[in-house]
Amino acid sequence: MTIPTSISGFPRIGRDRELKKAIEAYWKGNATLDDVRETGRELRVRHWRLEKDAGIDLIPSNDFSLYDQMLDTAVLLNVIPARYRRLGFDNPEETLFAMARGYQGERGDVTALPMKKWFTTNYHYLVPEFDSSTEVRLNGTKPFDEYLEAKSLGIETKPVLIGPYTFLKLSRDAEAQELTIDEGLVDAVADVYAEVLRRFAKLGAQWVQLDEPYLVLDKHEGDVSLFKSLYSRLLPARDSGVRVLLNTYFGNIADIYETVKLFEFDGVGLDLIEGRDENLKAVEHHGVAARTTLFAGVVNGRNIWRNNYAESIALVEALQQVTANVAVASACSLLHVPFSTKGEEQLGDKVLRHFAFAVEKLEEVREIADLMQLDDDAKRQSTALAANQALFDGSRVVADEVVRARIAALADADYVRRPERGERQRLQREALGLPLLPTTTIGSFPQTKQVRAERARLRKGEISQGQYDEFIRRQIDDVVAKQEQIGLDVLVHGEFERNDMVEYFGQNLNGFLFTKNAWVQSYGTRCVKPPIIWGDVSRAQPITVAWSSYAQSRTAKPMKGMLTGPVTILNWSWPREDITHEEQTKQLALAIRDEVLDLEKAGIRIIQIDEAALREKLPLRESDWHREYLDWAIPAFRLVHSAVQPSTQIHTHMCYSEFNDIISDIDAMDADVISFEASRGDLVVLDAIHDAHFETEAGPGVYDIHSPRIPSVEETEERIGESLAKMDVNKVWINPDCGLKTRGNDETWPSLTHMVQAAKAMRANLD
């Protein structure tokens, strides 16, 4: 019996980030919208052919997006807030970009939709927003156009959409924020999906994939009935001849599997990486509907290590004990891994053979399915299976005994800072002499073409290290002078020497590997190139001390030392799979601790340890939060800073996340000051800070740096006022949402000037 193969989705940015380059050229006025459309078409065609040639049977379509798949779904359902409609753009792409980035120009001035992390990944989605004008209906033809585009090439695809349950659970109300999901809304949304199924049936589609990752979360009152209501109304549209694959990922659906089974979906996608044990038990206990094919998600779409074929085969065989209808699939979309290992030959074959990026994962899916066709004797004789097993026999790296000994010697006292925070705050106010509502930035300043060009010249050997260092010193001189000129209270050196907040540190730590082109989409056109944790981690030498010391010598104002924290380095790297995340984080924490103490010795009085990604990997089910994550992630941060003097002020920063539910754990990090990325979330974190009697001083971001908009002084004053209404004035800091690296100077300096003016005005009112 032939075993079908499937993937949930494929990276959309292109092997060389062609999509990013085309869209950004359009935004800068250097390309037309037709150029962007043509680039998109070329990428889709290239990827479909690649997937077909790799032997994938159920090839996805509509997994492509110019910005974000949730945003595309909102547009498809006509969930377009009135403020964007009023802009009156002639083409849907401009409206979509305004929703994603905001708009400031002759047509008006509107903020962007909120942006949040996509479950536990580093991908960000735009939050669909319902307002009083919303009329849910089918809008546009994107999914159908892309299906027909593939069909014209002779490629049959499986259209992919975000499912209605996930779409509604991740949406919000423009006014109340929490969306009221009443019967009328459920029916309207389900009817659109039913119409989509019928249209695809008329076009000849055999399968439609509905992604429902929200099913892996804890179920609250009304959740199961919502799922039932949606699918009871839309599934009869299958009668038109199309099959429906309910696809889940990022965890298990054990608590709703029995309900899912009753609907007799044509296919059910199960994550057998992150939800392995629970999903297997659910299938074994409840069985499988006769018409249902189980899509066994055995190829990891979230890490870059080679698949262990023997383990994957065992998982598929376990499902085959329950049903003969099994397909081999990716555990989630391959959106979250780089394009291909081709072009990374500098790593050497002995290293590279351990990695599989998106293209190689297509081959893994096909190869596992092929191996499943063999009998036991043929499997034992399979050279492919033997070659794969050789990757997992024995140890890949030699342990660093010095690092292991440091970890073994850690005691409880190493995780505790003295004295308590209240006493430290008093000492720090005396030492630093800052005003009420102190102003600062998160760390990075715009990296211009010139900065990137000089870094490239150094890499190519066209300039010496000394010439490059002199260039960086001039950049620091300039940014320090400008910060003083506009009146910021706590300064930063701008991070011009850093290509990336994680990769830069990895390049100065033992145990890391780096790629040339392994880019992954984070949001829109923003891409990241995570380093790879290959072996045990330790600090090779001081990393930031020289630049921070130089910057401090250029000003009498406090200069922040800027570091990336251990949990964020782990979460924004490709972590090892041969030792635990906890062990890797302790290694990183000790390395960054060494850097913190060296900065303090060099006279840096404020040290920021960014934990931008702390919330990102919080398990999706609350019962797992502490046991599987927070019980080691929070102490790891404390380990980094526990040995500094009481007068040294420790800052941290966190990016797009939901903080409300772990606000007490964040307080337990025992930082002195924390800045939150909050402006796109309407500062809802303020309620959590207030209700939890949050002790850490805090700076909820007062403007959104992911949008090119320049906020007015009045707008910023309003934001500050919202903070003051919920927080102790002595604990409020004023700062942007995030680092300014990706913005332009033309946006950055006016925005910061307005921020400082707003802070001074509010300060004067307090006096």
UniProtKB/Swiss-Prot annotation:
Question: Which is an annotated GO molecular function term of this record?
Answer: 5-methyltetrahydropteroyltriglutamate-homocysteine S-methyltransferase activity
Q: Does the keyword Lipoprotein apply?
A: no
Catalytic reaction equation(s): 5-methyltetrahydropteroyltri-L-glutamate + L-homocysteine = tetrahydropteroyltri-L-glutamate + L-methionine
* Statement: the UniProt record of this protein carries the keyword Isomerase: no
Which positions bind L-homocysteine? I442, G443, S444, E495, D610
Write out the entry's keywords from A to Z.
Amino-acid biosynthesis, Metal-binding, Methionine biosynthesis, Methyltransferase, Repeat, Transferase, Zinc
Offer one Pfam family short name for this entry. Answer: Meth_synt_1
| The record's free-text note on cofactor binding | Binds 1 zinc ion per subunit.
Top enzyme class, one word, equals transferase
Residues binding 5-methyltetrahydropteroyltri-L-glutamate:
R17, E18, L19, K20, K117, R526, C527, W572, E616
Q: Which SUPFAM superfamilies match?
A: UROD/MetE-like
Q: In which pathway does it act?
A: Amino-acid biosynthesis; L-methionine biosynthesis via de novo pathway; L-methionine from L-homocysteine (MetE route): step 1/1
CDD domains per UniProt: CIMS_C_terminal_like (cd03311), CIMS_N_terminal_like (cd03312)
Q: Which cofactor does it need?
A: Zn(2+)
Q: What residues make up the catalytic site?
A: H706
Specify the superkingdom.
Bacteria
Listed binding positions for L-methionine are: I442, G443, S444, E495, D610
EC number per UniProt: 2.1.1.14
User: Which parts of the sequence bind Zn(2+)?
Assistant: H653, C655, E677, C738
Q: Which family does it belong to?
A: Belongs to the vitamin-B12 independent methionine synthase family.
Could you tell me what this protein does?
Catalyzes the transfer of a methyl group from 5-methyltetrahydrofolate to homocysteine resulting in methionine formation.
Name of the protein described by the UniProt record: 5-methyltetrahydropteroyltriglutamate--homocysteine methyltransferase
Which gene codes for it? metE
